Every structure is written in structure tokens, then in C-alpha cells.
Amino acid sequence: MSDKLVLVLNCGSSSLKFAIIDAQSGDDKVSGLAECFGLEDSRIKWKFDGGKNEAKLGAFTAHREAVEFIVNNILAEHPELAAQIKAVGHRIVHGGEKFTRSVIVTPEVIQGIEDCASLAPLHNPAHLIGIRAALASFPALPQVAVFDTAFHQTMPEKAYIYALPYKLYREHSIRRYGMHGTSNIYICREAAKVLGKETKDTNIICAHLGNGASVTAIKDGKSVDTSMGLTPLEGLVMGTRCGDLDPSIIFHLVKQLGYTLDEVNNLLNKQSGLLGISELTNDCRGIEEGYQDGHKGATLALDIFCYRLAKYIASYTVPLGRLDAIIFTGGIGENSDLIREKVLNLLAIFNFKVDDNLNKAARFGQQGIITQVGSPIAMVIPTNEEWVIAEDAIKLITAK
């Protein structure tokens, strides 16, 4: 029986990953994914004791229903496991400048997360649903919030300050924050092991690619630049987010086309990206199927996605000085050999040479180098944000 079990809830914009993890060993006792929120085939899958399970959540369900299913179905069937849980850990995308490290959840912390919701409109509200559901279901357990933005507090000013009047930062904290920090912590640690280096001596570029996507330059184990900005909207092309664009487009939409600001916000966050370009889907699996079938919109969306990603990776060699490896992670990064190949081919100036067999083998949880011997290194590492969250949760409640 472990005294370090943590229930981790990781509420994404269109999915919810959950796990009961031994914070010391990283072993999953239960792990699962609820996905396709807002669609007709919303579902939940989980593993327990070697067995795989799946259930439908119902059409157009989302985070709240997924949390209720975990509590009322999965944990209710295994009360002995539920009794061993020492804390609930929550991944929080945006903590602004208020939260620079993980914290135990209090009413003040909940309010702080809510105050940052405008900076992560697809995520922080979902996190709050998870926190409130967990507080109701586990009133006696400490709850811990782990912030994606905390890892990026090591960025220098030249990386996080926008070219706006400085008083906007000084008075209103408008700056680059970055996300996916919890994933970056794990990836850097695991990449260092593969490379035979200490984390503090490791220089990598991490491409975390999912429905939300970002690139981070990590020098000597610390974040020095990242593609997401004040909010998760900046940077790469994503599932429904536009990423970088000329800010004057917003003025044009409002003044010339009659959009309201709320409509523009919805357009840029929920109707753009892969979905907007392809006019097909925000799901990269569907985009790849369309690409293989010759669908014009899907092909264009995939090409723009890969081109933008390759440009960011190339630019992030600037702050590193030395590049030990490019790491692909996240749902797309871990499973799309097509996107990895296209991106590395676009980086031909750096002499990356993809090993077709290794690249195709690195899918469905398989980790490994995907480039040829003698080539600069690119590898796939499945992320494990949940383990990092569990570790922080146990550290905090032990230190109380």
C-alpha cells in the first residue's frame, strides 16, 4: 500500500486526462482519458490493473460529466484504491504573475485562477470545474494546483516583454507567460536521460503538439523562450486557435466587417486553426485522413501547421547556442509520424535526416530517437504531466 497516491485531473480544452499515480515511482494505478467533448461521440477510456475499459459519456458532454463519471463509477468500484488517495492535483494552464509555483488550493487560490480565466479562456474555466467537483467529492483531501506558467518564469525580459509601452507590463502585467510548462519539466528530465546528460546541462527544443500546441526553448534545463504568450492563443497553428496573426486583422473584423469583440474572441479561439483553414475538423487525425484523401482544405491546413512549427523551431536555435535535440510530444507529437517527417524535412538546413522505420515505430506511447545515425537528434517522448503534478502535490502536503 502506497502513502503517496495522488488523483491527478488534467482538464484540457477538449479533453480530460486523469490518473491515480504513485508520486514516488510514477506508476499509474488508474489512468484514463475523456475526449471529444462537445461532439456526439464524447467518451471515456481508462485502464486499471491491466484491463482496458471504455464508456460513452453521452452526446455533447464535457468536463463536469467526466469528473462525475470518475467519482461515481470508476472510484466507486474500487473503494480500497480511493481510500489510499492522499491528495488531488490539478493542472492549471495560467497563473499569471500571481502564481509562480504550485500551491495548495484555498478560496483565495480559486479566485486567483478565476481572475486569470481571461488569459486562458478555453482552459482555466475547465480547471475550475475540476477543482470544484473534486472539492465536493473529496472534502477531506488537500487539493493542489500546479501551474503551466510557473516553469517559464526563468525567461529573460527580452523574451517575455512585448514591444508595447512598458507601463502596460509595469501596471497591468501584460507580458509573455507561456504554457505547457509542466510537460516541459518532464520532457527535459527524460530527454536528459536519453542524451546521457544532467538536466542542468541539457539544451532542447520541445514541441508539445495537441489541440493546443507550443514550442519551448530550454537551455540548461530552464525555459528561455516559448511560443504561447499572454494567453494560449499566440504562436503555432492549433486545433481551433489561430496562433500568430497581424493584430490589425482584429480592427478590420470589427470596423469593416461588423464583428463584435466577443465574436472576434470566439473566432480566433474556437473557429480558427486547423478547423478554420480546413473547414473540416479540428482533430489532427481527421486532418491527416483528409490529407491522404486529397482534401484541399486539409492539405492546406497541414502544410500551414508544419510550416509554422518548423519556423518556430528554427528561430529557437538562437537563444540556445547549442541544440542537443528536438523533442516531439503531446497527442500529435507522439503519434503523427507524418507531421514529424514533414517538419524535420522543412528543417533540412540543419541536416536532420529522418529514419523512416524509427519514425513510424514511435507511436502509441513508444519513445525513441527518430533520426538516422549521424544526424542531429530528434526524438519522441510521451509526456507525463500527471507524474510531475503528483510529485508537487506530495511535496506540498508533506511540507505543511
Curated annotation (Swiss-Prot):
GO terms for biological process: acetate metabolic process; acetyl-CoA biosynthetic process. ATP binds at K17, H208, L209, G210, N211, G212, D283, C284, R285, G331, I332, G333, E334, N335. GO terms for cellular component: cytosol. Keywords: ATP-binding, Cytoplasm, Kinase, Magnesium, Metal-binding, Nucleotide-binding, Transferase. InterPro entries: Ac/propionate_kinase, Aliphatic_acid_kin_short-chain, Aliphatic_acid_kinase_CS, ATPase_NBD. Its EC number is 2.7.2.1. Mg(2+). Can also accept Mn(2+). PROSITE patterns: ACETATE_KINASE_1, ACETATE_KINASE_2. It is an enzyme of class 2 (transferase). Pathway: Metabolic intermediate biosynthesis; acetyl-CoA biosynthesis; acetyl-CoA from acetate: step 1/2. Substrate binds at R91. Mg(2+) binds at N10, E385. Gene3D superfamilies: 3.30.420.40. It is found in: Cytoplasm. The keyword Transferase applies. The record marks H180, R241 as: Transition state stabilizer. The keyword Transferase applies. It catalyses: acetate + ATP = acetyl phosphate + ADP. GO terms for molecular function: acetate kinase activity; ATP binding; magnesium ion binding. Homodimer. Belongs to the acetokinase family. This is Acetate kinase. It comes from Shewanella frigidimarina (strain NCIMB 400). The gene is ackA.
